[in-house]
Amino acid sequence: WKIQTIANTSQLQFDQEFGNTFFGTGDTLINAESLMKLKAKNPIEALESGNLLIYEKTQKNHAYIMTVDVSKGRGQDYSTFTIIDISASPFRQVAVYRNNVISPILYPNIIYKYAKVYNDAYVVIEANDQGGIVCNGLYHDFEYENMYLESAVKADKIGVEITRKSKRIGCSSFKDLLENDKLEIVDQETIMEISTFEARGQS
């Protein structure tokens, strides 16, 4: 029965439904009640060798935002992006990309491709460490201008520099959106990650 149920849903949904794992205990950033409401969906399509999961196709006249995290591409941390439909409340997660071997030099190609697919999505890239390479590649090489800039004049001011302050603001905004049902997250891996976010001190 358990195997059949998991096959028809997912391990995450089974654990949520039947109490094997209780998310949101301890000092998680998002409260338990909100975490329990999150329901993973199956993607309607997998592209880019399975690294890109599509949950909703692009809709005409809809506005999208793409948030981008960059890793070194050496098989450890993942370079990821999430595409959110921000046309109406609640906002909806519509696509997720994850790849732990893509080089920061090649990553702008993928970002550009799907930012264009999703109606020239507004792109926000974490500029720390390898992120600067990706920011400059997208903005200067691809001449993609619909992205967050701290300054268009200074080369190192493209994207968002993650500091303790900006992380605190970002986490607070994310918490507000989720706990007030203003954002729907449907990707299983994303839900698992959200469930382990911990609130630690001032950061």
Q: PLM features: residue spans?
A:
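RNase H-like, metal-dependent nuclease domains and their acidic two-metal-ion catalytic environment used
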Residues: 2-152, 156-164, 168, 172, ...
